[in-house]
Each structure stands twice: as C-alpha cells, then as structure tokens.
Amino acid sequence: MKRIRDDVYASGSQFRRPLGSSRGQLCGQSPVHGSGDTEEEEEGGSRRVSQKLTTNDALSYLREVKEMFQDQREKYDRFLEVMKDFKAQRTDTGGVIARVKELFKGHNNLIYGFNTFLPKGYEITLIEEDDALPKKTVEFEQAINFVNKIKMRFKHDEHVYKSFLEILNMYRKENKEIKEVYNEVSILFQGHLDLLEQFTRFLPASLPSHSAAQHSRSQAQQYSDRGSDPPLLHQMQVEKERRRERAVALRGDYSVERYDLNDDKTMVKIQREQRKRLDKENRARRGRDLDDREAGQDNLHHFPEKRKSSRRAEALEAYSGSASHSEKDNLKSMYKQAFVFCEKVKDRLCSQDDYQTFLKCLNIFSNGIIQRKDLQNLVSDLLGKFPDLMDEFNQFFERCESITDGFQRLAGVMSKKLFSSEEQLSRPMKVEEKESEHKPELEAVKETEQCKKEYMGKSIQELDLSDCECCTPSYRLLPADYPIPIASQRSELGAEVLNDHWVSVTSGSEDYSFKHMRRNQYEESLFRCEDDRFELDMLLESVSSAARSAESLLNIITEKKISFSGSFRIEDHFTALNLRCIERLYGDHGLDVIDILNKNPATALPVILTRLKQKQGEWKKCRDDFDKVWANVYAKNHYKSLDHRSFYFKQQDSKNLSAKSLLAEIKELKEKSQNDDDVLLSISAGYRQPINPNLEYEYLNRAIHEDMFKVVQFSCEELCSTKEQLSKVLRLWENFLEAVLGVPPRAKGTDLVEDVVINPKTLDVNHSTSPNGEAAVSSGGDTARLASRKLKSAANGDENSSSGTFKHGIGLLNKDSTGKENLEDVEIANRDGVACSAVKPQKEQETGNEAEKRFGKPIPMDISERAAISSISIPSGAENNHCVVGKEVLPGAHEIQAKPSDTLTDIHHDVDSIETVHSTQGGDVGNSIVLANGLRSDSSKGTRNSDDPEGPSRNEKEEGELSPNGDFEDNFGVYKDHGVKSTSKPENSAEAEVEADAEVENEDDADDVDSENASEASGTESGGDVCSQDEDREEENGEHDEIDGKAESEGEAEGMDPHLLEGESELLPQSERVLLSVRPLSKHVAAVLCDERTKDLQVFYGNDDFYVLFRLHQILYERILYAKRNCSGGELKSKNLKDTNAGDPYARFMRVLYGLLDGSAENTKFEDECRAIIGNQSYVLFTLDKLIYRLVKQLQAIVADEMDNKLLQLYEYEKSRKPGRVIDSVYYENVRVLVHEENIYRLECSSLPSRLSIQLMDNIIEKPEAYAVSMDPTFASYMQTELLSVSSGKKEEGHDIVLQRNLTGLYDLCKAMEGVEVVNGLECKMSCSSYKIAYVLDTEDYFHRKKKKKKTEQLWQRNKVRVERFHRFLSA
C-alpha cells in the first residue's frame, strides 16, 4: 500500500535518490542485507527495492545537506557532530534519530533522505506520529484494566492468572504463535466467555478458529464502515519481522573528511561491527519496547476501531514473553513462586515506596542496566532486615540461574506486571511525568552503584574523611553515597538510638594507637606481668568453675536424683566454658573425653573431677610463686615506667647536639631577627654591623665551672692518646675557654712563682714627679713590688739594659680625635725635672695622615683623655740632651693620673693579658721592650734593617695593618698617639739618666728626616717619637749594606731581637708565646664606639668550630647545674632508694658520672641512679656521656686545626692591647682576612654578671682593595717617589726646648674642637694608567658641632622677647 508520506515526499522532495533508487528506499524500506544483493519483495501491493548503499550515496546526501544549510553553517556542523558521536558510540541509533529530527525540522526531504541510511525498524515518521501516540494511551489503559479484571476474577485461583501472564510473556518473547496463544487462553478461560470475548478484541482478525474468524469478520465490517486501514495483525507481524531481521545502521563519519574513500570496504566493516553491537542490545531494546509504547499516552481517546483493536493486541504483547519449549515447564513453576514471593515482600515491607523500589530494581535488572551482584546489593539494602526473605530471594536467584536468562525473564515479568499494575491502579500518569520520574531514579541508581563499586573492598579506615562534616574532634560523617551495612537483628529501639553515619576513624593498630606516646620498655614489662596474671587467673577461675559443676553433677548422680534416659544432656549441667576447660585439660584427647562424658557420665565424672582439682592445686601454687616474681618486677619497673620522656629525648638529643643542628639553630634565629632597617643603617654607616646577639646565656654559678673542668679532664685522660694532646686540650680549656668566660684561675702551687705576671687592671699606678725629677711609681699592691723585684733581678749588668723596662705602644686610633689633619703630635718628656717637647715635622704628619684611611664615626678626645689611654714607657738611658718621652703636663693643669682599670678577680685573665718582661742574659743584646700587643722589642740598632738609608724601617709595623707585601706596606703611614707614661722608677737619678740615654741612642733613628717615610710606625708607637741624631748617622752609614728584599722573620717584623726569640721564647708562658708569630692583618677598619661598658667585656671572633665548642660547653653547664639544683629533692621522690645515708646527693651523682665515663658503670645503672637521686625529671642527664664525648672531640679538633690556632693567636694578639684600646672593628677585619667567606661568630662575655652572647655576623663583601702584588710597578714607583715622599733634608743637630707655655695653642685648638663630630669618609680612587684621581660615590666627609643647651635656651629667650615686643606693637 502506498503510504501518505510517500506522496508528500514524491511531490515536495528536492533530494534525488542517488543511483536511481525508488521512493520506498528513501523512506527507509531498503535494508542492507548481509549478502549485499538486491532484493525485491511484495508487501501490501507495494514494491520495495533493497539495494546496497555505498559511500558515494552518503557523500551525495552530505552535499545535499550542506547546500540546504549553506547559510546556516552551524546546523551542518551540528549534524557532523551527531555522526561523529554515533561513530564513537557516545550515542545510539535512537539518539541520532531524535537529534536529526530536531535538527532537520521543517526539511522533510532531508529527513526522508536520512531514513535511507537507517536500519529496518528505525525510521523517522512525520504524519502518523501525531495519531499513534494518543491511541496507545487508550489501548494500554484498556489492557491494564483487562489484566486487573482477570486478577480479580481468579483471585482464589492464582494459577489461572499467573498462567495467563506467562502465556502473554512467552508471546512477547516471540516463542509462541498467536494461534497457540488463543488456544491456551481459551482453555484457561473456560466457563468465562466474557473474558474470552474481551481478550479476542486484542487479537488480530485472521485466526483459524471459528470464534476468532467470526470476531474478525465483525471487526472487519467495522473497519470498512469507518474507512480505516486493514486489521493490525499484518502490521504487528511486520514489526516482529523487523525486530527479527534488524538491518545494520550505517555508521561512520559523514563529514567531508571521508572523501578519500573510493570503495565500500569500510562500509562492510562498519556493518559487521553494527551487527555484533545490535546482538548485545537486543535484550535491552526489548525491554524498552514497553517504554516506547507508554510514551504515547495523551488525552486523545477516539480513533478508528480497526486501529484500536490492533493497538490493544500490541499492548498485550508488552506483557507477553517467550521461552524455549524445553524450559517451559520450569518457567511455569518459577513464575508461580516468583509472584508468591512478591506478595510476601509486599506484605512484609510496610512502606509502599520500598515495595515500588524493589520492583524498580527488578525492572532495571531485566533491562540489562545492572548486573546480578548489583541487584543483590540493592535488594539487600531493602530486605536486609528480613533475613528469611533475603535467603529465599538468594535461593530463588540460584535456581533461576540454571535456566538461560531465566531470572532476567522472570524479573521482567514480575517487575513490569506488578510495577505497572500497582502504579497504574494507584495513579495514572502522563508520559512526561513518568519520564521525568523514572529517569532521575535510574540515574541515581547508576550513581549509587558506581559509588558502591568505588567503596567496595574499602574499610572505613581507608576512607579520606578530611573533607566530611565534623561533629566532634573524633567523629566525622560518612559520605552520603557510602553503602551503610544493614543490621539484621536491630530492634526498633536500637534503630532510634544507634548510630550508623557518624564514625570515629582509628589511626593505627592497638600497639601503635598512640604514636606520640609509645610504651617504654618498663611499661612493656608491667603489661606482660598483667597479661600473665590475667591469664593465670582466668585459668584458675575456669578450672574452679568446671570443678564446681562436676562436683555438683557428681553429687546428683550419687544421690540418684537424675536418670540417664534419653532426655539427659551433659550441656544442661556444664557450660560451654566448662566443657572447653575439660577439653583443654586433656589436650589432643579432649574431644574423646567429652564424648565419654556424654555416653557414661557416672564413670567418667569422678576421674575428670579428680583431674580438675589436681590442676587447680598446681595452678594455685604456681600463682603463689609467681606473685613474688611479679611483685619484684613491679617494684623495679613501676617507677621507671612513669618516665615517658627519656626515650624520645635520647633520640632527639643526639640530633640536637650535632654541629649541623647547632649551626642551623643560630641561622634560623638570625633570619627571624633580621631587620631590613638595621641592614640599611649598617651599610650607610660604612658597613658597620649592628650588635644584636642571637643567643644569650648566663653563667651565674661559678662553682659549676670547676666541676666541668674535672669532668672534662677526666674524660680527656680517657680519650686523648698522648700526653701532649692532653696538655694542649687542657691548656685550651683553661687559658682560652675559661678565660673568655671570666672563670677565676685555679691554683697551681709553685708554678705560679716561675711565671709571675702583672695584670695592668689590678694595678693602681699613680704617676708623680719627685722634687729631683725622678718618676715615682706608686703601686697598689704587693704584686707590683714582686714584679719589680723580679724584673730587677733579671738584669745582666749591662749599662744599656735596665730591669723593669716597660714600653707600651698604643693601638690604631679610630679617627683623628681633634678633627685636624695636620695636628702635630706632642710628646712631653720629664727627665731630671725638665719638661721638653718634641714636635714632629709638619710634612711627616701630613704624610702619615694622608696615607691613613678612616671609617666610621670619630671619637672626640681631649688631651687628658689621650693621656689617660696612652701607653706606658720607661726610658732606657740617654747619651745627650735629646727629648725623652715622659709625663704630659698641660698648662694650669694638675698632674694627670692614669685611670686604673677595674680590678678583676679573674687572676687567670691577668695571666693571659699581662706583658711579661724578661731581661736578656748576654751583654751584646739590646734592651727588651714590651710592645703594645704584649711583645718584646729590642731597641738596639742592630735589629733594624733597611733597604736604603732613606726608606722606612722594615721591622716597624702598625697594629691592625695587613702586610702581604713589605715594599708596598712600608709606603703607608698611620696616625699615632704618642702620649706615654712611665711605669717604673729607677733606683736613682743616675740610673734613670743612663736608661734614658740608652733609650735615645737606640731609637733616635725613628725621627730621622733622611727617611723618606718618617711617618711609618715602628713596632712600638713611641719608638718613632724618640729623636736621636746619633742613631740617624749610624743608620745612614750602616743600613746600606743590607740586602734588598731580604725576608724578615715575624719576630723581626715586630722589632724584636732574633736572639731573644731563639733564646727566651721558651721562657714565656703559652699565652704569650703565641704572640711571637702574629702580625696585623687588615689595613682598613670601620669605626666603632668606645664605651665604658666595653672594659668588662671579652670579645672573641671565631668560626663554626668555636661556636660549636661554646654551645656544647653551655649545654654541659646547664645540665650539670640542673643536676645540682634537683639533687636536693630527688631522694624524696624515689620510693625504692635503699641507701638513705648516702651523703650529699650531688657528690653521689658526680661519682656515678665518673663511673659512667670510665666504663665501670653501664648506662642502665647510671639512669637508675639518676632517677633515684633526682627523680623522673633526670632524663636530661641520660646523655651526659655523649655530650662530654662530643665536647672533648671538639676540643681535640680545634687544637689540631690550623685555622683555629690562627684565630686563637689573633685573639691573644688583640687581647694584649692595653685595656680600653682594643678596637673591635680592627679585630673583626683581621678575622675576616683569615676566614675569608666562612661564618664569623661574635662571642661576647661580660664579667658582672657573667653572660655570654653569640651573634652570627653578616658576610659583607666590601669593595676590593688594591694590594701591592697586583699594582703596576710604574705606578707603585710613582706613588712612592712623588706622592709619599718626604723631604730628604737632615735634621739639625740640636732641638729647641719646648716649654709648656708653647702648648697653649694646641690646647686652645683641642678646646675649640670640643663638641665637634668629624667623619672623614670621603674616598678617592686613582687610575694606574693616567694617575687621574676621582671621588668614590656614596662617600663623604662630615663635620657637625653640637649646639650647647645653654645657647639654645638663650636663643629661645631672645625670640620670646621679640615676639612679646611684636605683640605689644600690634596691640598698640
């Protein structure tokens, strides 16, 4: 028959079928067969031609679509996306049809053309679609009503109703013909003609039976009267045929990218894949047939009778099924059981929603959406609280698995029938409402199943609940999609009060439940004792209970109160624990004994009772014995078990004591305290670093130092391999470590007599002038007299030598105190009561000041202050009237008394800081002079060497000056302060006169004008100020013979006699012996402020080794102090201390510590003793042996390290300066020269109170200095001859006597400079090639005069008067 849409297509289509295809093919009636041949078949008078489609057909269709939407490119692109999604299996055929239909809406020719490529059974209809949907609604409702009518009619005979559903289901599964259906239903409805007649309305008209034919004729008459189509049987058969012979849909990407295909091989491959895929989808598609039919429910109820009848038959087919003939009998019985089970589930489930959910689960399983395991999980959620129903469901499931797709078919029948009947009887719904309801439910089920798969096999401990809701710190809410296990025996009360959703996640197993508080070994011992006691108690209680039960039963048997007939059971008299006890009592034969007891209790019971009492007695005796053992364990371990900190402390302390950890600690503190403003300020002030200690410690108990020394000494004797190493380590401890910390030295018996030294800080020296002109020295103590006697006794009789000769030089000054570059240095000598003054040449002063480089802030200093800090010198003799350094006297001023330093109790510090003077034994050796740094200097001319008569002396070096190259170094001069005072008194004036003459004779070359660089400082500061014409002449005649470039020894560089170095160096103590090999290192230093508080400070600059040493020392000090403080109350805390008369607890602790160090005591014994003496807080002392070992090893490393020894020598060198003259910046710069880029630590110790502060200094990289080794020789010669040269003229023979009244100008100048701040920070740089001088950026000079407060007040008063006058003028 020719369909209406064919006419529409023929009249209105602009799309031409490629290769001459008919309209029928374009309408979707040309399936692609597997053989690929062309088929022709008659169907309702119409001729359909099925021809194989090619790629060209698809490309032609694409061109047509592209031309149609050439102005709407997005639609064409969307069509290509649909094809790509279908190829990638992201959508199925139904989805493609829906999207194409919507996309080509209004373009029927394209839709009909697209039908050409669809398989059989799939086509897009446009006209009939509007009529088909409302008809299905009426037919479906009538079918539902008919099925319910049958159910009500045969409610007492469920077999008929279930058999009817089984027949329909088999028909729906295409396993039963329509004739068989009618015959079986006729037999089933025998005696109920109304039901049979109503049933025939749903069947096709052409049936062989008479009743069916008669009914068909009446129906045909009705169809012909209404002019509708033939009966629907033919259409139903055609649809069934289409379902059986579904063609393969054309799959592929129909985009223009496929133009390169020139054959149909790809099409054949796609068709094969589609067949395989459709085979898997058949089962799911059959289940969707019902949903497709339900989609047509609308409010239209009127349609032709012929079509209505066919639609009713189709609705009945929705409930019909099919099964193979061999499985027919099994399915029948299973259907009956299934429906009975469903009714039982409905009755047990109180909620109708739960029952509907159960049916939905069966439905989605029958459609192949979920698997068997998923279904069982879903059903267990619903029926878990009914174990009997769950067991019956699982058994029924297993029986159905024996039949091919048995349960799936059964589930489909059960779900569709019951679900549809319950749903439709309760509330008929529209298709839109159904789809909107079922689709979210199916999606929710799928998501739930997916989440269950994720959570499957995972315990709650493995879940990540960090993002879940938190109720308390311990409890968190489980995820909403986490499957909650069903409690099978939960009561209603339990369901109300018990929790299923809030869980407390454990963090580990039982043994490690508290990772931050693990049980120590003593607790483990206690736990084992408790376990043993509990187990033995349980055994005793078990055997006692079994014995009582056996004895009671035996008494009953003896009294014959029980009969051993068939009703006797041994379990009625023995509990399970009793029987288990008897079984364990006999071991492998326990089951046999129980069997004998059951068979013959009268005979077996006495034997068993005897055995039970025997074991009971043995175990009681065993418990009594073990009680003593357990009591001993408790006594030993209870107190120790309370110590939870020692285990972790011992683990962590080994890391904390390592050098890496200590270094990291101070670096971290420095980074935290780092202030950007301080850094900028330090840079702007000439790279002066702020003094901000990173660590500070106090040493308030000095008695601890003695205990520490003894402990370290004891350990060193055990660890040091040689006596020499032991001596070096102990000397480092005493002479350096304790000296820095201000620890008083310990007595050494007669050794102190050999090395008597004088500490300037302990002397109160008053300088005065006697009437006869002799310098009088007043000593404040016996120490000075003892030293004076010793110095006199060291004299060798040489008239040029003097006992007690002192000569002190001053250190490098920070700035020109007066702020005047050409300030003349004045020396005031006092010999024979006559004061004289020597003024250095103006050119010499200018040259010295020009070469000096200054950094930092100047320190204003008047003459009195300079005199107070001046060096001490004793003239060694005089051969003429040359001026000798003496006491400085100012006009109108009283005599100046040297300010005594604070007297320290630290005698050992005095030993380290005093300059010991030894007289030489040979008459040919010159006088020994104590330098500013504590060294002796020979003043005889024989020790002076020079390359030329006009050059500077090689052996005259300035403190704080780096000397990498002698030639270059000698070209620089430094500013010198020449205030010198006498510190010893000659016995008579003649002796003083001789000494003065010798001094002048030996050192008058220092001011020789023939020297080109007369400003070069000698080893002693005052040496250059003593004028001697005879020495000048001798230098002119004798120093030309010296070899140019001769290397000088370090001792000679300091102006010392090499004979003294060789002969008497061994007589010096170790603290002074290191001074013989040191020299200044750095040329340029930054300014520092001299403060009164610095007089009590000991400053040491060291590297990482010294920092670690002081930190280990401090830790050891704290722990021993901790032990001493806690020893008083420790014994009261210990309950197991037996020796109550042990004496001093601290002394006992020290004895135990010595035993640990020498190996006589083990660590366990030491820990026990510490707990007994101090208590549980003694855990910090358990690692003392390791701490002391590290400390001794660090001492050994410092003694053996070359760089560390250099730092120690440099410290002694700096410490040898006169108190108050130590310049911190000089020291720091010298250390920087040594350690280069390593860390530098500033260790500062104050004496009152004893406090140690440690600071990690910044590594500031300053601008590089030009050393002589890298300077151009031509430029060096130019600088020496032109820039740094002085007048070569000789001095006149005589010198004018300078009276004190001539110093008035200088005094006025100094007074005028009071309150003035001068910073000479301007720097210049010179080009070595062009000799051009340029200023250095960011450098400047600074001059500021502080205004007096009085002047400010006067100015304010004047301004106030002027303001008042102005106001009066305005008011007038």
Curated annotation (Swiss-Prot):
The modification Phosphoserine is found at S1049. The keyword Ligase does not apply. It comes from the Eukaryota. SUPFAM superfamilies: PAH2 domain. It holds the Pfam family Sin3a_C. GO terms for molecular function: transcription corepressor activity. Residues 51-121, 136-206, 331-400 form the PAH domain. Transmembrane segments: none annotated. Keywords: Nucleus, Phosphoprotein, Repeat, Repressor, Transcription, Transcription regulation. It is found in: Nucleus. Residues 1-50, 210-244, 272-323, 764-783, 791-817, 934-1056 are annotated as: Disordered. One of its GO terms (cellular component) is nucleus. GO terms for biological process: negative regulation of DNA-templated transcription. Its main location: nucleus. Disulfide bonds: none annotated. Residues 272-315, 938-957 have a biased composition (Basic and acidic residues). PANTHER family: PAIRED AMPHIPATHIC HELIX PROTEIN SIN3-LIKE 1 (PTHR12346:SF68), SIN3B-RELATED (PTHR12346). Interacts (via PAH3) with ALY2. Interacts (via PAH2) with TBP1. Interacts with ALY3, GATA21, TRP2, TKI1, VAL1, SKP1B, FBX5 and PUB14. Acts as a transcriptional repressor. A histone deacetylase (HDAC) activity is required for transcription repression. May play a role in telomere stability. This is Paired amphipathic helix protein Sin3-like 1. The lineage of its organism: Eukaryota, Viridiplantae, Streptophyta, Embryophyta, Tracheophyta.
